[in-house]
Regions:
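Secreted/extracellular ectodomain signature
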Residues: 20-132
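Positively charged n-region of N-terminal signal peptides that target proteins for export
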Residues: 1-4
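Bacterial N-terminal signal peptides
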Residues: 7-15
Length: 132
């Protein structure tokens, strides 16, 4: 009886432990990294359009999207540049990684407080392109 009770408790504990472990989300089947190194509205519009097109084209399989902003392109992420703020914020909310190059930030004396809070910083824009 004691052995049976211990076996039942062990099975119950294993079931609870298993139930609390959520399965990991399946990785996206597709991945794309865009680079943005120019400071003009037409290029930013085209980039945001391409992001939307990619998301729609691969929504069934899943797609991981990252944009690396460096050089003059980093101005898209400055809080003072509000023209594309809402669209960039929505992209970030949808899972798009918006990476700001720290090398460019240092060179242009841009601080973390100067860029949108929904962006992330990467050590080097070019290195990030190579890594991903």
């Amino acid at each position: 009886m004691k052995t049976t009770l211990l076996a039942v408790l062990a099975l119950a504990a294993a079931g609870v432990a298993h139930a609390q472990t959520a399965p990991a989300a399946a990785p996206a089947k597709h991945k794309v990294v865009f680079q943005m190194n120019v400071a003009d509205n037409d290029s930013w519009n085209q980039l945001l359009g391409n992001i939307g097109n990619a998301r729609r084209a691969f929504e069934k399989d899943g797609i991981q999207i990252e944009v690396v902003f460096y050089g003059k392109g980093i101005t898209a992420l400055l809080k003072t540049n509000t023209a594309f703020e809402e669209r960039l914020k929505k992209a970030a909310a949808d899972g798009v990684v918006l990476g700001a190059c720290q090398n460019t930030m240092r060179l242009r004396k841009i601080t973390s407080e100067d860029i949108f809070p929904f962006s992330t910083e990467v050590d080097s824009g070019v290195a990030e392109l190579i890594r991903t």
